[in-house]
UniProtKB/Swiss-Prot annotation:
Induction (free text): By polyinosinic-polycytidylic acid (poly I:C) and viral haemorrhagic septicaemia virus (VHSV) strain 07.71 in muscle, head kidney, spleen and liver.
InterPro entries: Dynamin, Dynamin_GTPase, Dynamin_GTPase_CS, Dynamin_N, Dynamin_stalk, G_DYNAMIN_dom, GED, GED_dom
Region G3 motif, annotated ranges: 142-145
Any matching Pfam family: GED
Organismal lineage: Eukaryota, Metazoa, Chordata, Craniata, Vertebrata
Domain GED: from-to ranges: 549-635
GO cellular component, one term: plasma membrane
Protein source organism: Oncorhynchus mykiss (Rainbow trout)
Region of interest (G5 motif), residue spans: 243-246
Metal-binding recorded as keyword: no
Keywords: Cytoplasm, GTP-binding, Nucleotide-binding, Nucleus
Protein name: Interferon-induced GTP-binding protein Mx2
Binding site for GTP: 41-48, 142-146, 211-214
Function in brief: Does not inhibit strain RB-1 of the fish pathogen, infectious hematopoietic necrosis virus (IHNV).
Region: G4 motif, residue numbers: 211-214
Length: 635
């Protein structure tokens, strides 16, 4: 078979195709899509005949499903005089083929091993490499023919199984879809073309191949010419037409070389189709040239994105591998050091977590939660103070009526003052305990998340850490609650430094006076409406009872402000100290204590089977991606 690629492409073809073949052989296609040409067609479309004509070897033929696994057909053109060479690879095995006539049986044997004897299909790839002076530099992926109806022995959904397999390949944007259609059927009704149009509606990566031109009904030849001229169903890459060996010629043992000569004569002499030959749209050699050029151009176009994808996948894989950790070493001494390092790193991160420092194991920030919740606590205390200020006038008046004894008007009842203050402070106790429990749980979750990040893949070590975290949480929460309740008991002792109280009282009086003056101005502005202008202060001061109440309210507001601000700070300090800092310190002590228990070391280092398998898979993936990256750099 003669090929007329110009020297420019001759120099680019083999290296480009070899690069993609090498990447595919590495298994990179598991990680990203590679440029490829996938061959699809309905059953009996002549697909196998086209591939036979291109490769020069007989492929499995017959009725029903013949191609039962994706077949990667790698053709490498050799110099004239060099010997034919073949090799088949599948399921991590490789076998040399000495004789071209053995290819068909080798493929059948591989399919039986992979898809089972009979009519089942498999997604696993068979790779067939052929080196010969009579083949083009080209790699194709042959896919099973599309079956419309299940035959004896086939699953009822065989058609859907095949379509699913085909879609797996043709959906990828990196794949050129080679659609094989017989000339003697309505092209618009073929399943293969419909599937190609579903994934490539604009026809940008679809190439049509018409077969069996000798079976065209008389009078419809011009329709075939119109199809090839892209005037019926448009495809950007256009159409080619070929005539391969028919069953009669195969029975007569017509060689592929002779079949190529007969094909050439058929088109040259055909009354209608000769124009397609003259235009370069016909014969297997012209198809081979077009496919080679299309593939090389496609590879060149895909190369920049391919490099980007490999670099992205490398970064993703390294990150995933880092999360999996390195795994424990085999040497007993090294295993102990490994465990010490792992536990020490965890406990140091626990301390850093409690102090708001940066962590080595992931991004966990419990302080943002604490800051938000402490802010809510302060806002709650402030609201409580405002509500208290609004209701104390009524409470003081009611209390005076019920409990004032022999005192003369104008004397402040200190007992009334104490009772009201204590009652108001007591109302903050349960909300404070509730806040403690919320933040204790937040701290527990943060420490558990840290343990999960630190001990990924070591379930027993993680369980040990979690158990200790849960126990410490209960202990520290209980201690913190007791401390808070003690704090509130102390707050029931009405006390503050005289200077502090005097300062607060003066400030409160000044605020009240400013408020009254504001009310006075407001009332003066309203006097033109006939409203009486009365000084609030004179009204209150005019009555001894009111003077007493006013004085009492000033004292209550002043003291409550001091006590509430004390609690606004003290509650967060207790929580932060006990359920965070002390929590972390005790966790550090207890985890380091486990290192003293030498008998438990092997148990603690038992690794999760899934993590071990995942690490091995990621290491394998990293290895092939690095090789792929090197291939691209050297290309």
């Amino acid at each position: 078979m003669n090929y007329t690629l110009n020297q420019h492409y001759e120099e680019k073809v083999r290296p480009s195709i070899d690069l993609i073949d090498s990447l595919r052989s590495l298994g990179v296609e598991k990680d990203l899509a590679l440029p490829a040409i996938a061959v699809i067609g309905d059953q009996s479309s002549g697909k196998s005949s086209v591939l036979e004509a291109l490769s020069g070897v007989a492929l499995p033929r017959g009725s029903g499903i013949v191609t039962r696994c994706p077949l990667e057909l790698k053709m490498k053109r050799k110099k004239e005089g060099e010997e034919w060479h073949g090799k088949i690879s599948y399921q991590d095995r490789e076998e040399e083929i000495e004789d071209p006539s053995d290819v068909e049986n080798k493929i059948r044997k591989a399919q039986d091993e992979m898809a089972g004897v009979g009519v089942g299909i498999s997604d696993d790839l068979i790779s067939l490499e052929i080196g010969s002076p009579d083949v083009p530099d080209l790699t194709l992926i042959d896919l099973p023919g599309i079956a419309r109806v299940a035959v004896k022995g086939q699953p009822e959904n065989i058609g859907e199984q095949i379509k699913r397999l085909i879609r797996k390949f043709i959906t990828k944007q990196e794949t050129i879809n080679l659609v094989v259609v017989p000339c003697n059927v309505d092209i618009a009704t073929t399943e293969a073309l419909k599937m190609a149009q579903e994934v490539d509606p604009d026809g940008e990566r679809t190439l049509g191949i018409l077969t069996k031109p000798d079976l065209v009904d008389k009078g419809t030849e011009e329709t075939v010419v119109d199809i090839v001229h892209n005037e019926v169903i448009q495809l950007t890459k256009g159409y080619m037409i070929v005539k391969c060996r028919g069953q009669k010629e195969i029975m007569e043992r017509v060689s592929l070389t002779e079949a190529t000569e007969r094909e050439k004569a058929f088109f040259k002499e055909h009354a209608h189709l000769s124009t397609l030959y003259d235009e370069g749209h016909a014969t297997i050699p012209k198809l081979a040239e077009k496919l080679t050029l299309e593939l090389v151009q496609h590879i060149e176009k895909s190369m920049p994105r391919l490099k980007e994808q490999i670099e992205e996948k490398l970064e993703e894989t390294r990150t995933a591998l880092e999360k999996c950790g390195t795994g424990p070493p085999e040497d007993p001494k090294e295993r102990l050091y490994f465990l010490i390092d792992k536990v020490t790193l965890f406990t140091q991160d626990a301390i850093n977590l409690s102090t708001g420092e940066e962590l080595k194991s992931g991004d966990i920030n419990v302080f943002s939660t604490l800051r938000t919740e402490f802010g809510k606590w302060k806002a709650y205390v402030d609201r409580s103070g405002k509500n208290f200020n609004k209701k104390i006038e009524k409470e003081v008046a009611d209390y005076e009526k019920r409990y004032r004894g022999r005192e003369l008007p104008g004397f402040i009842n200190y007992k009334t003052f104490e009772v009201i203050v204590k009652d108001q402070i007591k109302q903050l106790e349960e909300p404070a305990v509730k806040k403690l429990k919320e933040l204790s749980d937040a701290a527990r979750k943060a420490f558990i998340l840290l343990a999960q990040n630190s001990f990924t893949g070591f379930p027993i070590l993680l369980k040990t850490a979690k158990t200790k975290i849960e126990t410490i949480k209960q202990e520290k929460e209980s201690t913190a609650e007791s401390t808070l309740r003690t704090q509130f008991k102390m707050e029931l002792i009405v006390y503050t430094q005289d200077s502090t109280y005097s300062s607060s009282l003066k400030k409160r009086k000044r605020e009240e006076e400013e408020l009254e003056e504001g009310e006075l101005v407001k009332n003066n502005l309203g006097s033109w409406k006939g409203l009486p202008v009365v000084s609030v202060r004179s009204t209150v001061n005019g009555l001894d009872t009111h003077a007493t109440l006013r004085e009492m309210m000033l004292h209550l507001k002043s003291y409550y402000h001091i006590a509430s601000q004390r609690l606004a700070d003290q509650i967060p300090m207790v929580i932060r100290y006990l359920v965070l800092q002390e929590f972390a310190s005790q966790l550090q002590r207890e985890m380091l204590q486990t290192l003293q228990e030498k008998d438990n070391i092997e148990q603690l280092l038992k690794e999760d089977i899934d993590i071990g398998s995942k690490r091995a898979a990621l290491q394998s993936k990293l290895k092939r991606l690095m090789k792929a990256h090197n291939y691209l750099v050297e290309f």
